[in-house]
UniProtKB/Swiss-Prot annotation:
Pathway: Carbohydrate degradation. Signal peptide: none annotated. SUPFAM superfamilies: NagB/RpiA/CoA transferase-like. GO terms for molecular function: S-methyl-5-thioribose-1-phosphate isomerase activity. GO terms for biological process: L-methionine salvage from methylthioadenosine; pentose catabolic process. It comes from Petrotoga mobilis (strain DSM 10674 / SJ95). This is 5-deoxyribose 1-phosphate isomerase. Its EC number is 5.3.1.-. Catalyzes the isomerization of 5-deoxy-alpha-D-ribose 1-phosphate to 5-deoxy-D-ribulose 1-phosphate, as part of a 5-deoxyribose salvage pathway that recycles this toxic radical SAM enzyme by-product to mainstream metabolites. Belongs to the EIF-2B alpha/beta/delta subunits family. DrdI subfamily.
Amino acid sequence: MTVVPVKLNELKNKLVIIDQTLLPNEEKFLELDNPEEIWEAIKKLRVRGAPAIGIAAAFGLYVSTLKSKAANVAQFKKEFEEVRDYFATSRPTAVNLFWALKRMTRRFEQEEDKTVDKIKQALLDESEKIFAEDQEMSKAIGKHGLSLLKPGMGLLTHCNAGGLASSGYGTALAPIYLGHEKGYNFKVYADETRPLLQGARLTTYELYKAGIDVTLICDDMASLVMKEGKIDAVLVGCDRVAANGDTANKIGTSGLAVLAKEYGIPMYILGPTSTIDLDASTGEDIKIELRDEEEVVNGFGRRTALKGVKAYNPAFDVTDAKYITAIITEKGIVMQPYKESLKKLFE
Ligand code: MRU
């Protein structure tokens, strides 16, 4: 993945993102430094995918408050908290957003006895750390994930959990990139991922450009390709993993997991430990984002149902832990019983 989808500009005073709503047809980079633009970019999925949302929020919080003219730390803190709380309203499901905002807050509090300028410097340092750690995490996830795969395998993925959803290497696609470097010749099937087509627009874009064998399928073809024996493993990312292993990911993931179980295909969830939320005991505690009905009936400029027809548009679903073969993090591979194995990751 050559494009870094979320980063700071050279002067380190603007957030730079590739506008993912325009892909694959146009590669347009946006430079943002005000909270409203950054909030809008997250909300509208110009930057999306759990790890990338966290990085955008951290860099966004830094660049938004960098311009502050606050005369003292108390005033600066008030401004910082206002932007932080505003960003927290952008998208509810991916816990990485809240995780990154919490990390930035903790760092602020550690430096609170310093000058405003020193605190700004510390916020830059923390956001750059979040970015750098994400790159390392992706590579480690790739390594652990690859240990479960064999050359020539057929792999099914859903939505986009690749470089575009992170700092440039991805989660579910990380083992695929690593395997590609080692000549594994995977055959990747990418679900289109209705309604916003992250699979069609983003996953095939990045895998095709990387020279990886990728075939696009409509979401409703997953069962068929499994039955035809084309799929040896399902690899998906995650937006929030509860303490018992229940996992929120892009709408449609839970259906794939049920199918995979029926056909005896392993279902792997890949994500950094920042996506694990031990405060959520089960999937019931995960807030699922409901998005505009227009995305379903009028997604890409053409109305597909009569005006007035109701549409339901939850952006995520929760896969019950019982359908998940393993959760692959940068710290290693965990299996059932997830309540114990996930907890151990944080000890
Ligand atoms: O609505 P999106 O595009 O932000 O949803 C993204 C997903 O569901 C991804 O699968 C998930 O964030 C994992 S990204 C490594």
